[in-house]
Amino acid sequence: MKDEMMAKIMDEVMKKMGGTDAPAQSMACEAPQGINEDLCGLTEYVGTAMGHTIGLVIANLDYSVHELLKIDPKYRSIGILADRTGAGPQIFAADEAVNTEVCMIECPRDTEGGAGHGCLIVFGAEDVSDARRAVEVALSFVGKHFGDVYGNSAGHLEFQYTARASYCLEKAFGAVVGKAFGITVGAPSGIGIVLADTASKTATIDPIAIATPGNGGTSFSNEVNFFFTGDSGAVRQAIIGAREVGKQLLKALEPSEPLESGTVPYI
């Protein structure tokens, strides 16, 4: 049943999606999938989540690998979140984790053939239990943050919001810790520019950065990402305004295909 649900959800967020309906229930608070030895008995394995996301942990990282990754020597243990589809959902999910430091965030060009990214996040911890818990927490929030990801065979849209950004979002996107933070993502990239313009005109927000295919911010993916902060209500309103415009534009590229949330919209 879980495999069936995953297939349905991924149909909505990856390039090769079609007419599959989105599941009716929210996965926002669901426990991480696959945390049992039936799927993988290795001690490094923590679990999986949508977007072909896998959670891993290394209790005592080899010294040479530790050094090459440039991780603070005090962190003997690391937690890893890696995926094929999505960067925003996993990064916002990782922002919920505590008692660890985010040592690395990289967004490879991926989306399994689509227009966007995959993601690699590494947590550092002095105790392996903290590293494992950080990965478990992040996995449990991935489904929620796919709630405002929309896609068809022509491209995708992504909208993320938090009322209070923490250190993962600061490291990844330059968010102000403790303040409301939002992002809009549009692919093809021209749609992303319209989303940024719409968000800025919808409410009074403070832009932080814009990532385009060639300015080093998107690993040359065919999308534009807009990052901003401000009053919580304004940030939320800016995202809602951009979302309405973006869905109309992306739908125009493939009018016959559904354009629905991957899980349940949360903004």
Stretch-by-stretch model annotation:
Residues K2-G86, P108-G118, E126-D127, F146, ...:
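A structural signal for small-residue-enriched, beta-sheet-centric alpha/beta enzyme cores
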Residues I80, R84-V98:
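N-terminal low-complexity, intrinsically disordered segments
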Residues A93-A97, A138, L195-A199:
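Buried hydrophobic packing segments
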Residues N99-T100, D127:
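A glycine- and small-aliphatic-rich helix-loop capping segment at beta-alpha/alpha-beta transitions
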Residues I121:
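Long, structured ligand/cofactor-binding scaffold of large enzymes
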Residues R133-F141, A238-V245:
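Short amphipathic alpha-helices in soluble, non-transmembrane regions
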